[in-house]
A protein has these predicted regions:
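Positively charged, small/polar-rich N-terminal and surface patches that mediate targeting and assembly
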Residues: 1-102
Length: 102
């Protein structure tokens, strides 16, 4: 088994969920996260004062799947989450030794 973690734009969450469902993924975890990479944030004006927003809002989608599904799931996430702009996100894959139901 492997855990696939994808950090994506919040607006792409519904598309990614639908793509994962098409792949046969039946469970996932979604977490709101903040961070930056090459995008580095942006500057915003509010009531005449300039503010720097350095940590951007993203969504982390986590799925634990059989290793045989890994390539299909990664391709589905990439296709659904990609806009072609800087800040589309990252995908991380880690091995899972065991998953225990509580």
């Amino acid at each position: 088994m492997v855990k696939v973690e994808a950090i994506i734009r919040p607006l792409k969450l519904d598309e990614v969920k639908a793509a994962l469902h098409e792949c046969g993924v039946r469970g996932l975890t979604v977490t709101e996260v903040r961070g930056f990479g090459k995008q580095r944030g942006y500057t915003e004006r509010y009531r005449g004062t300039e503010y720097t927003v350095s940590l951007l809002h993203k969504v982390k989608v986590e799925v634990v799947i059989p290793e045989e599904m890994m390539d299909e799931v990664i391709e589905a996430i990439m296709a659904a989450a990609r806009t072609g702009e800087i800040g589309d996100g990252k995908i991380f894959v880690t091995p899972v030794i065991e998953a225990i139901r509580i």
